[in-house]
């Protein structure tokens, strides 16, 4: 297992870069109301596929979300298992905040998402920070052969989560992804995930890690290749044990 690597998290940098990029077009209220303004923009658009290719609201939404540090535990699980210098793919990258942290920590990061305002901003951020990294368009060719691929808070946006996992598994030796439990009042941008079935799919692989974070986010890391019956049994046991432990802790509170 690689030595512990500290990621440099600077939330103020997220806002500062967006301000610089947008200049006079920057709207502080949209950053402060990052969720509401995105919901409003989606309602006005009315077409999910078009929305993901045209949204400017995601510039604010993803910036504000990055500033919370919510995904830092996800990244720390990755760097515990994959050393700097490894080739990793940020799949569904948005504005690229996660991959930028990894790139500055010495990883060979590549990005993939639809061509949209978020990836145009990402290209600016890479140049602004003096970094070079490919930004692949999901509508075109996305390469494989990566040491690891991750997709954080992405799978709940797709129509077929199992096809999505297959896309990740084809591209890297290690897959890291999180599954969000549906909650009442969920945003219209999220599809309810069959979490139990997705965890069952993962358990048929060699499980490297499983954690339940933030009360509803099932984070899994697993090998994409074939595995033995014994390893599948171990993987299922680890998932069951973690869920039982978390449920017991929640009931004790």
Please tell me what each predicted stretch does.
Residues 172-184:
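Conserved beta-strand signature within the Rossmann-like core of class I S-adenosyl-L-methionine
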Residues 158-171:
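A short, conserved alpha-helix within the catalytic core of class I
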Residues 119, 159, 184:
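Conserved protein kinase catalytic core
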Residues 86, 147, 173:
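Conserved acidic residues
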Residues 150:
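A conserved beta-strand element that flanks and buttresses the S-adenosyl-L-methionine
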Residues 154:
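Hydrophobic adenine-recognition pocket in adenosine-nucleotide-binding enzymes
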Residues 157, 186-191:
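Histidine-centered active-site/metal-ligand motif
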Residues 1-143, 165, 189-253:
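Conserved N-terminal segment of class I S-adenosyl-L-methionine
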